């Protein structure tokens, strides 16, 4: 199970890639 921290980190990284 991914923790909120891991999820947030992945989400931020995805946003950076998209941007």
Curated annotation (Swiss-Prot):
* Compartments in which it is found: Secreted
The record's remark on the cofactor is:
Binds 1 zinc ion per subunit.
This chain's function reads:
Catalytic subunit of coagulation factor X-activating enzyme, a zinc-protease enzyme that acts in hemostasis. Activates coagulation factor X (F10) by cleaving the Arg-Ile bond at position 234 and is also able to activate coagulation factor IX (F9) and protein C (PROC) by specific cleavage of Arg-Ile and Arg-Val bonds.
Q: Name one GO biological process term.
A: proteolysis
Every copy of the Peptidase M12B domain together lies at 10-19
Q: How is it modified after translation?
A: N-glycosylated.
- Record has Lipid biosynthesis as a keyword: no
Free-text tissue specificity from the UniProt record:
Expressed by the venom gland.
Q: Which family would the database say this protein is a member of?
A: Belongs to the venom metalloproteinase (M12B) family. P-III subfamily. P-IIId sub-subfamily.
Tell me, what is one Gene Ontology molecular-function annotation carried by this entry? metal ion binding
Name its co-factor(s): Zn(2+)
The kind of enzyme this is, by top-level EC class, is: hydrolase
What Enzyme Commission number(s) appear in the record? 3.4.24.58
What reaction does this enzyme carry out catalytically? Specifically activates several components of the blood clotting system, including coagulation factor X, coagulation factor IX and protein C by cleavage of Arg-|-Xaa bonds. Has no action on insulin B chain
Q: What is this protein called?
A: Coagulation factor X-activating enzyme heavy chain
This protein's GO cellular component annotations are:
extracellular region
Q: How does it assemble?
A: Heterotrimer; disulfide-linked. The heterotrimer consists of 1 heavy chain and 2 light chains (lectins): LC1 and LC2.
Keywords from the UniProt entry:
Blood coagulation cascade activating toxin, Disulfide bond, Glycoprotein, Hemostasis impairing toxin, Hydrolase, Metal-binding, Metalloprotease, Protease, Secreted, Toxin, Zinc
